[in-house]
């Protein structure tokens, strides 16, 4: 991402509430038309950052640029951004149409023009004919859509969404995720989306910033965040991960490997080692990257272990396999392909099980 | 989990639930009956203490005075007198004028106070509210006399202004005038305005205000389009709570009003006292009640209209 593409540039922004440092120092760029998520546990500063973009909080230090303009001195009602609030903040004294048309007041439009725009928005959010409904007659999902329409009708440069799906039940949330993504593609507006739900962030986003304790840990595409996390915190926050202690061994400039506690020696191409000989590392492997078998697989990296626990989850099962040299059992996730296909579900009585994996799936992280 | 449900089932088979009595059963089934039971003490007091006297008043208003007793033949004579003789209309008009001004002044003065506590005080809100009601812990009569001291011919304001050299002679319009009555009423009823205003402002979800700002409203537009309409129930409640009792007030005008400040309440009191024309007093009370009801309805209608207009 080059600077000219960036619609939002956050430059060395810090935020303190009294003695509490909510944002340590954050710099990042958000591109035009991107669906960008701020992901992190509660209290990580993601909502504070969003509210600074909206202008509801000042930056203590640093500067935010939107479309090239510094935002420090721009009050929230003059910023080219609009927000969908976590509580939706639908005006209870107005009907649906007046809620959606609320921000159009300053645009010098006739009543007919305003109503036409509202009707277009109602079609877009799939609630045609709802204009005269009162706010208290709406369900959670409908309120959410109206909050969205009320912001989108103003054609902001950036739409900020503060956990907008958090209050919905699971099914509705999944449906709204798909609709939100489709809507974003349709209108082409940059979305900045705050969530603590990693699955939601992975489903929706072009790029995700993983935050923790007021810092940005990694900004990347969902796939790279999952496959190539840069730190243990990111690896542990997104999905499940097995960690093994290891040491880098370089054999001159020809080849290299990682000695691990539990998984034995894993040969890796030199360009992936990126660390000097003897450096301590952590080796991380996702549960679904392991293959289980009852006999030692030919030509693959493998270790033997014993099944200590199993959980059946329908489409897949989780197994916990104890191996020598590793205090905690290794988590393995394996699809249930059905009777006669793949491995029949193992039981603890089966005797030794073999775990195999590909070196490509291995992630090297700094030792902690 | 399964164990406990099984155990529960076994218990209930051994010992079937006790059946309640017929009255209790009836009350259990009917929510309306339970509701009436709950309000029955209040209902009894209302009937004995308000509806009965009101009916007596109503009957009395159709009688006429005869010497020291009543002529009990029903007649509209009193109502016709109230309608035709200008003194009654003038007094009613003055009463509504004085208490109307007092109401508007009270609500306008109390709204910022309630707003401040609701939006800008973050700790010890209740303490602030209690402090605001502190003056009302002393007797009404004492407060009226306090205003007498402040507004009097040689009172705090006049002597203060004279000492400053701002005025040569004491301001005479301060005491024993409509101004005095309005000032005192506005002060006396402030607590009744602050509390409903505070409650309605406090209830407003702060994210609605942020949403309005986010959608392009500056502070003034936001106040007019969100805060004020959403606090309207409090404003209406405050207006009613002040306007209705102050129109009939007779203590304040009697003590501070002077000749120009007498209100309908003083006149009604006279009818039941010195003039000894109870039927006329009853008629005036009924007429006052009808007028207040009419004004309240018009007021409600206008605020509804205004609210629809603003939004």
Language-model-detected regions and their locations in the chain:
Chain B
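Transmembrane alpha-helices
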Residues: 41-44, 48-51, 130, 134, ...
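Transmembrane alpha-helix signature in integral membrane proteins
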Residues: 86-119
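C-terminal transmembrane helix and the adjacent membrane-cytosol boundary/short C-terminal tail
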Residues: 3-11, 18-21, 26, 198-209, ...
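N-terminal signal-anchor/first transmembrane alpha helix
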Residues: 2-6, 12-56, 126, 130, ...
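Short membrane-interfacial helix/loop motifs at transmembrane-helix boundaries
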Residues: 50-86, 150, 154-155, 257-259, ...
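Interhelical loop and adjacent transmembrane-helix boundary motif
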Residues: 29-34, 66, 79-88, 250-300
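Non-cytoplasmic
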Residues: 53, 57-60, 142-144, 189, ...
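Membrane-interfacial helix termini and adjacent extracytoplasmic/periplasmic loops
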Residues: 24-28, 76, 144-186, 220, ...
